[in-house]
């Protein structure tokens, strides 16, 4: 497993070196700055590295956005998953922190919350925005994507009846045979 990981990282590094601009632009940094930048990147967690490192896409990738990078497949693996699956190159927009739409939505919500707090309507804005996000977060069954698993089928793979739960028929029978409330 670690050998395959090392091969994948080597292939990724080769692809990254091929996509780098000429060394003339990197010569402007002093060796101390390069060492400090490398130490910062090594110490940063994975999600932070994506935002600290920004590499422009090579001209060939801009001309053909459908280009994909293929990882090397180990020769000795027959029953394991193949490593020759296509991995799309990340676009420069994917790496930009400011174009993350979720971040912008949260930032807008915080700014509006601050405004309404100053106007002394902060609690009303907070409660109304909670109802709005609950509405947005729920969706009807017609919006389900083709082939998407339901939560029930994820936790109960065969969709078998669970002992102690009511079936739809049992529930209907219980509701119809029950006397009306208050009579």
Curated annotation (Swiss-Prot):
Alphabetical GO biological process terms: protein quality control for misfolded or incompletely synthesized proteins; rescue of stalled ribosome
UniProt subcellular location: Endoplasmic reticulum membrane; Cytoplasmic vesicle membrane
GO terms of molecular function: UFM1-modified protein reader activity
Keyword Membrane: yes
Gene Ontology cellular-component terms listed: cytoplasmic vesicle membrane; endoplasmic reticulum; endoplasmic reticulum membrane; intracellular membrane-bounded organelle
Region annotation Disordered: where it falls in the sequence: 11-36
Membrane in keyword set: yes
Ranges in the topological domain labelled Cytoplasmic: 1-105, 127-183
Low complexity composition-biased segments: 16-36
Superkingdom to which the source organism belongs: Eukaryota
Stretches that traverse the bilayer: none
Quaternary structure, from the entry: Associates (via N-terminus) with ribosomes.
Family affiliation: Belongs to the SAYSD1 family.
PANTHER family: SAYSVFN DOMAIN-CONTAINING PROTEIN 1
Protein name: SAYSvFN domain-containing protein 1
Organism name: Homo sapiens (Human)
